[in-house]
Amino acid sequence: MNPSRCRILAVGKVRRDWIQKGIELYLKRLPGLTVTELRDSSPEKEADSIRAALRPDETLIALMEQGECLGSIPFARRLKQFENERLVFVIGGADGLTAELKLQAQWQLSLSPLTFPHELARLMLVEQLFRAQSIVQGRPYHRA
């Protein structure tokens, strides 16, 4: 996984300082990975903002409760399959993503069968991206 070929689009702001610090920690470890915050609104307006921010050459990965749930090693392997593509991970607002955006996604991903606040999901995603990179590169961060 090449962090400079990945980005995260997330609806809403991170309001908890400790979550923001965690996100910043992993972003420093993944140079090139960016997070773009989109304004909270109605699901339809959020979907319009997301679509406007998407680039034609990106593979859309929608984070959603009903998505595919993988362990860290299978997640790393799956990301490796996309290594030559530009990836955009999308985290919707409190009401999630619209049905149209979910269908537009090339991969529907769930971070867990549990439900988490969206700002915490953002932290979990950047940590898992770092973990996936360490698994693929054979670095000792992941201990299983």
Curated annotation (Swiss-Prot):
Specifically methylates the pseudouridine at position 1915 (m3Psi1915) in 23S rRNA. It comes from Synechococcus sp. (strain CC9902). This is Ribosomal RNA large subunit methyltransferase H. Pfam families: SPOUT_MTase. Its EC number is 2.1.1.177. The keyword Methyltransferase applies. The keyword Amino-acid biosynthesis does not apply. The gene is rlmH. It is found in: Cytoplasm. InterPro entries: Alpha/beta_knot_MTases, RlmH-like, tRNA_m1G_MTases_N. Homodimer. Its main location: cytoplasm. S-adenosyl-L-methionine binds at residues 63, 92, 111-116. GO terms for molecular function: rRNA (pseudouridine-N3-)-methyltransferase activity. SUPFAM superfamilies: alpha/beta knot. Belongs to the RNA methyltransferase RlmH family. Keywords: Cytoplasm, Methyltransferase, rRNA processing, S-adenosyl-L-methionine, Transferase. It is an enzyme of class 2 (transferase). It catalyses: pseudouridine(1915) in 23S rRNA + S-adenosyl-L-methionine = N(3)-methylpseudouridine(1915) in 23S rRNA + S-adenosyl-L-homocysteine + H(+). PANTHER family: METHYLTRANSFERASE (PTHR33603), RIBOSOMAL RNA LARGE SUBUNIT METHYLTRANSFERASE H (PTHR33603:SF1). GO terms for cellular component: cytoplasm.
